[in-house]
Amino acid sequence: MAKNSVEFDRYIERKAFDNTKEGVKGLIDAKITEIPRIFHVPQDTLPDKKRSVSDLEIPTIDFASVNVDTPSREAIVEKVKYAVENWGFFQVINHGVPLNVLEEIKDGVRRFHEEEDPEVKKSYYSLDFTKNKFAYSSNFDLYSSSPSLTWRDSISCYMAPDPPTPEELPETCRDAMIEYSKHVLSLGDLLFELLSEALGLKSEILKSMDCLKSLLMICHYYPPCPQPDLTLGISKHSDNSFLTVLLQDNIGGLQILHQDSWVDVSPLPGALVVNVGDFLQLITNDKFISVEHRVLANTRGPRISVASFFSSSIRENSTVYGPMKELVSEENPPKYRDTTLREYSEGYFKKGLDGTSHLSNFRI
């Protein structure tokens, strides 16, 4: 009986938080000094919740010479290959996205979340961003089996293949989102070429599989947390995408799990973070690795990040994906069963960010 009571209380508290439509920022605006218990992460995850003491750093790759000549491009492909096979993450500098575009999207995200009229934000509030061109929420997995909520608010929008009209986006971040998404799609085109070449295949092969077809932007706003040791910004997870391009500000807190240790992804001015998603690991048959990562809560803030997910759409999409035929053989048979983006993503979102791997459910 007591267990049911605890579970019922947790639902009631989450529902009450949901009903405010004010998110985590609403708690900060109310000047709380202790975070609600629904944000307390399980105690068994706390011992390793600390900043990295490792000297390890994820690879940084300079794209400046990617189209200069063949030797320069081949050298970059080798660096990309090493990064995605061994780390699953890398940072890119000289990626072609203008610095002013990077700054404006961060400013736009901040403007929306710090909108003075709360009714403007509330009008966009929805936990189901698959049915809305633009949605604002706090913890999409609010009612999932995830053991706790985490310290962030988010806005999300599908920018391709069916982008919103300008009128469907809030005025505070409209121009910034449209402009930034154009540059990210262009960078994604280049990244999938380099990844194809890193597989030893023709540069167009991943694009021909529609890896670049869908772009979902999720922009996170992490308010300062009065008790950062009790919660997380985002709990441990891997991405349900082919590829993710992340812009982060200078506050930090992103960590990746590498060789059983948490490694900080230190902010690099003007850089973008690129990471392999579950679907790219699946179709490359474990050639490229999708790595678990998380974001720590912080007394500093707000922290702002913009994550752009390629082909994480769960809208109607019947394409069946499995390990690429070019990468399997008798000696290296398929390690995953076939699935669709829709099937995979529906299970991923239903499960929530509970710290367990969804990809393992598809392993043969």
Swiss-Prot record:
Cofactor: Fe(2+)
UniProt keyword annotations, A-Z: Iron, Metal-binding, Oxidoreductase
UniProt binding sites for 2-oxoglutarate: R303
Entry keyword Mitochondrion: no
Cofactor note: Binds 1 Fe(2+) ion per subunit.
Stretch forming the signal peptide: none
Keyword Transmembrane helix: no
UniProt GO molecular function: dioxygenase activity; metal ion binding
Domain Fe2OG dioxygenase span(s) in chain numbering: 213-312
Record-level GO BP terms: biosynthetic process
Database matches in InterPro entries: DIOX_N, IPNS-like_FE2OG_OXY, IPNS-like_sf, Oxoglu/Fe-dep_dioxygenase_dom
Any one Pfam family match given in the protein's UniProt record, by short name: DIOX_N
Membership in a protein family: Belongs to the iron/ascorbate-dependent oxidoreductase family.
Protein name (Swiss-Prot/TrEMBL): 1-aminocyclopropane-1-carboxylate oxidase homolog 11
Organism per entry: Arabidopsis thaliana
